[in-house]
Swiss-Prot record:
PANTHER family: CYTOCHROME C OXIDASE POLYPEPTIDE 7A, CYTOCHROME C OXIDASE SUBUNIT 7A2, MITOCHONDRIAL. The chain crosses the membrane at residues 49-77. Belongs to the cytochrome c oxidase VIIa family. This is Cytochrome c oxidase subunit 7A2, mitochondrial. Component of the cytochrome c oxidase (complex IV, CIV), a multisubunit enzyme composed of 14 subunits. The complex is composed of a catalytic core of 3 subunits MT-CO1, MT-CO2 and MT-CO3, encoded in the mitochondrial DNA, and 11 supernumerary subunits COX4I, COX5A, COX5B, COX6A, COX6B, COX6C, COX7A, COX7B, COX7C, COX8 and NDUFA4, which are encoded in the nuclear genome.
Length: 83
Protein backbone atom coordinates (compact mmCIF):
# COMPACT_ATOMS: atom_id res chain seq x y z
CA UNK A 1 0.00 0.00 0.00
CA UNK A 2 2.82 2.39 0.85
CA UNK A 3 4.46 1.55 -2.47
CA UNK A 4 1.26 2.51 -4.30
CA UNK A 5 1.08 5.83 -2.47
CA UNK A 6 4.70 6.61 -3.33
CA UNK A 7 4.10 5.73 -6.97
CA UNK A 8 1.00 7.91 -7.04
CA UNK A 9 2.97 10.78 -5.53
CA UNK A 10 5.67 10.41 -8.18
CA UNK A 11 3.12 10.38 -10.99
CA UNK A 12 1.35 13.46 -9.64
CA UNK A 13 4.63 15.29 -9.16
CA UNK A 14 5.83 14.38 -12.64
CA UNK A 15 2.64 15.56 -14.36
CA UNK A 16 2.67 18.87 -12.51
CA UNK A 17 6.32 19.65 -13.16
CA UNK A 18 6.43 18.59 -16.81
CA UNK A 19 3.36 20.42 -18.07
CA UNK A 20 4.18 22.98 -20.67
CA UNK A 21 3.56 26.58 -19.84
CA UNK A 22 1.16 28.49 -21.99
CA UNK A 23 2.74 31.51 -23.55
CA UNK A 24 0.45 34.47 -23.87
CA UNK A 25 1.14 37.68 -25.68
CA UNK A 26 1.98 40.49 -23.27
CA UNK A 27 -0.80 43.04 -23.71
CA UNK A 28 0.22 45.29 -20.83
CA UNK A 29 2.02 47.92 -22.97
CA UNK A 30 -1.01 48.21 -25.27
CA UNK A 31 -3.36 48.61 -22.31
CA UNK A 32 -1.04 51.18 -20.73
CA UNK A 33 -1.10 53.28 -23.89
CA UNK A 34 -4.88 53.01 -24.08
CA UNK A 35 -5.53 53.99 -20.47
CA UNK A 36 -2.85 56.72 -20.29
CA UNK A 37 -4.13 58.50 -23.40
CA UNK A 38 -5.34 62.01 -22.64
CA UNK A 39 -8.59 62.07 -24.60
CA UNK A 40 -10.90 63.48 -21.91
CA UNK A 41 -12.65 60.15 -21.44
CA UNK A 42 -13.11 58.78 -17.89
CA UNK A 43 -10.84 55.85 -17.08
CA UNK A 44 -13.75 53.55 -16.24
CA UNK A 45 -15.04 53.91 -19.81
CA UNK A 46 -11.77 53.59 -21.76
CA UNK A 47 -12.01 49.79 -21.81
CA UNK A 48 -15.01 49.80 -24.13
CA UNK A 49 -18.60 48.60 -23.92
CA UNK A 50 -17.89 45.81 -21.44
CA UNK A 51 -16.35 48.28 -18.98
CA UNK A 52 -19.29 50.65 -19.37
CA UNK A 53 -21.73 47.81 -18.74
CA UNK A 54 -19.76 46.60 -15.73
CA UNK A 55 -19.62 50.14 -14.32
CA UNK A 56 -23.36 50.66 -14.73
CA UNK A 57 -24.18 47.28 -13.19
CA UNK A 58 -21.89 48.04 -10.24
CA UNK A 59 -23.50 51.43 -9.69
CA UNK A 60 -27.02 49.97 -9.93
CA UNK A 61 -26.20 47.24 -7.41
CA UNK A 62 -24.54 49.76 -5.09
CA UNK A 63 -27.50 52.15 -5.19
CA UNK A 64 -29.97 49.29 -4.77
CA UNK A 65 -28.05 47.90 -1.80
CA UNK A 66 -27.81 51.33 -0.19
CA UNK A 67 -31.55 51.94 -0.62
CA UNK A 68 -32.32 48.50 0.82
CA UNK A 69 -30.04 49.11 3.81
CA UNK A 70 -31.73 52.46 4.52
CA UNK A 71 -35.14 50.79 4.23
CA UNK A 72 -34.15 48.07 6.71
CA UNK A 73 -32.74 50.66 9.12
CA UNK A 74 -36.01 52.61 8.94
CA UNK A 75 -38.02 49.43 9.58
CA UNK A 76 -35.81 48.63 12.59
CA UNK A 77 -36.06 52.20 13.93
CA UNK A 78 -39.86 52.34 13.68
CA UNK A 79 -41.22 48.91 14.62
CA UNK A 80 -44.93 48.12 14.28
CA UNK A 81 -46.98 48.59 17.43
CA UNK A 82 -48.37 45.44 19.02
CA UNK A 83 -52.04 45.55 20.04
Amino acid sequence: MLRNLLALRQIAQRTISTTSRRHFENKVPEKQKLFQEDNGMPVHLKGGASDALLYRATMALTLGGTAYAIYLLAMAAFPKKQN
